[in-house]
Amino acid sequence: MRNKGLSFYKKKKKISQELLREIFSWIFGIALSVLLAAVVVIFLGKSTRVVGMSMEPTLENGQQIFIDRFLYVLSSPKAGDIVAFLPNGNENSHYYVKRVVAGPGDKVRIADGTLYVNGQESKWVTERILDAGIAENEIILGNKEYFCIGDNPNNSEDSRSANIGPVEEGDMIGKAWFHLKSGTDGIGFIK
């Protein structure tokens, strides 16, 4: 018979199969969620960086943003949306990121540094605009045309510029909806 005194051997604890199943179930669920999120972002979204200071203070130069490419398949852009587009559909250009301030059928004019849409002062541009560009004379937007301008209008090449002009809906990549950290700005949804 064996003495029940000191024993230098540890008893091995068995891990139950139920616990293993639970652990693998969690790992599989997390991995599947990450994979599904990646597929959604890759196929329905796009990632790009803001070029220049035209969208400050909302977005900073070099800030990474995510673009929803699917939204405008179901609906049209609205005033206030921040969109990414290729100017005049130029595939060789970087994406321009600007705010929609007017849509199809709207009348746009910049007078005395103020942006007017349909005769009303725009709530989207509060800074005095130094260069009216082509909007010095009233522009009536055509079907599926949008007037887009940077939140920092005096440091922005946008729809006021003759080489960009009103943006065609077909040239829009999608709506910017999320940004990553840049400088002091944290991650979050774009307003």
Report each predicted region and the residues it spans.
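Structural motif
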Residues: Q63, K78-I82, D106, E145, ...
